[in-house]
């Protein structure tokens, strides 16, 4: 009774936000959650919805041209859709937002406002064995519970034990905190939870937001380079980096910060391109350069030239 399902392409500015003729607020002001089904089809009926949705997803407020003025609402937005190819194939050729319509699948301003990407390919598909002939869970009761929980917030729960890494920006920290808060409300409705609970939810929340950011990096390039999301344990000062599982197979370069003295570069012979990993270590001795790991005379000569250049220009 507190959520609404919108079929693909049926959302209009009047039905979702506000009707300028009557001044009546739309679905975002009437429901707790709005789910756009088959969102990989045409998502909205008219173009005006996209900028309105951007404002709403950013601040919870919106304003249509006309007499309605600025209005606020609290409905959550859910985009439900399918990826019709293996995830590995999609990630090799494009990005996970590519199934969206052309109006939004490369609109980084819109996509950056998505706080959470749930990997549907990891979720078990229903089978007859998942259903029972006995008493089931009452969805009416569950919806009332969810509605009642909206008045509580645990967005500051992580601050007791953890801090977020420096690569999480404002648009990253907000959804991460909200996800942790939501999981606490679902799994600890009495408000009692431990550090271990929060850490588990924090890892999951960071992964879901990082999945969004990784796609933005594929679309928008260097603007979204900072995807090494992490959190720091306040007690031990240990920093933990949270990866995105499906990205491991597509990244030749590890997705955690490189250790000092390590870097990657690329070289080409005119026809082919090779990725090179360079590791520099210092050892006790007389300061002589020792090159290992390659038999290429050209590469060794390039390394010696670089080494000699650095020595000649180093500041003492």
Predicted features by range, described:
Residues 2-46:
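AAA+/P-loop NTPase substrate/partner-engagement loops
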Residues 17-24, 58-75, 98-107:
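Conserved Walker
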Residues 27, 45, 49, 106-110, ...:
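Helical mechanochemical/support elements of P-loop NTPase systems and associated helical scaffolds
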Residues 30-57, 75, 82-93, 109-110:
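Conserved AAA+/SF3 P-loop NTPase catalytic/coupling segment centered on the Walker-B
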Residues 91-125:
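A short helix-turn-beta junction within AAA+ P-loop NTPase domains corresponding to the substrate/partner-engaging
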Residues 115-205:
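Conserved AAA+ ATPase small/helical "lid" subdomain
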